[in-house]
């Protein structure tokens, strides 16, 4: 499982016919929305090059669109090009200083780079702008846990649970926090809650599959010591 709640992408081979239409310069508002959707699907399927090309062309036509920079930054990050990701996040925030998702994404960059204090500052900014940003609550809790602030990390995860989203993920992270904090009974209970919530998937490349596998490993580690 990734250290923070990043997306996990697979592989895509087929180009979108809408890409050719955009290259011809005949885009409409509806088509632009469709192309952004295509870029997301391409990225989720692992075809980062085509996804980035779509967003880059949209940016060329609308350089004032902060969301496109933020989305392209996320795909750069997922593809391993973290320097370009940071540049795009910064540009997105220059264009729209109230874009909570860009603060969350930039915080993920800082966390992955070991800059935990900078990450916390950006997560807090994201949550100030959007208190319902569940991923920012989860990510902030992981960063606090990395800093040894277990009690506050638990509080953040309990806040995240109030919104009724990503419960399996939240229970997994709360279980891991209890685990590292030494409260093994609470950890085991949360790991079991997470496994009951997460779907069983045959796709071994999916995020839920890798998350289940990680939780099972953590749980088995604790059950081994109990025996």
Feature roles, as predicted:
Residues 2-17, 188-227:
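Terminal, low-structured helical/coil segments at or just beyond the last alpha-helical repeat
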Residues 17-34:
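TPR-adjacent "capping" and linker segments in tetratricopeptide-repeat scaffold/adaptor proteins
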Residues 36-44, 67-78, 87, 101-112, ...:
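Conserved alpha-helical positions within TPR/SEL1-like repeat arrays
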Residues 57-60, 91-94, 124-128, 158-162, ...:
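Conserved structural position within tetratricopeptide repeats
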């Amino acid at each position: 499982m990734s250290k923070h709640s990043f997306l996990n992408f697979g592989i895509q081979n087929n180009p979108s016919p809408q890409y050719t239409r955009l290259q011809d310069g005949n885009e409409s508002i509806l088509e632009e929305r469709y192309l952004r959707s295509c870029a997301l699907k391409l990225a989720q399927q692992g075809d980062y090059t085509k996804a980035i090309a779509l967003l880059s062309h949209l940016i060329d036509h609308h350089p004032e669109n902060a969301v496109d920079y933020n989305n392209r930054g996320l795909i750069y990050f997922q593809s391993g090009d973290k320097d370009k990701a940071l540049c795009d996040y910064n540009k997105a925030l220059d264009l729209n200083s109230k874009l909570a998702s860009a603060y969350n994404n930039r915080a993920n960059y800082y966390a992955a780079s070991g800059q935990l204090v900078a990450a916390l500052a950006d997560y807090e900014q994201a949550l100030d702008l959007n208190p319902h940003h569940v991923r920012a609550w989860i990510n902030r809790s992981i960063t606090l846990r990395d800093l040894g602030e277990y009690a506050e990390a638990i509080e953040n995860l309990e806040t995240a649970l109030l919104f009724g989203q990503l419960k399996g993920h939240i229970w997994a992270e709360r279980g891991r926090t209890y685990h590292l904090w030494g409260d093994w009974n609470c950890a085991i209970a949360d790991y079991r809650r997470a496994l009951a919530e997460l779907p069983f998937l045959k796709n071994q490349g999916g995020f839920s599959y890798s998350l289940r596998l990680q939780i099972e490993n953590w749980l088995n580690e604790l059950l081994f010591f109990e025996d």
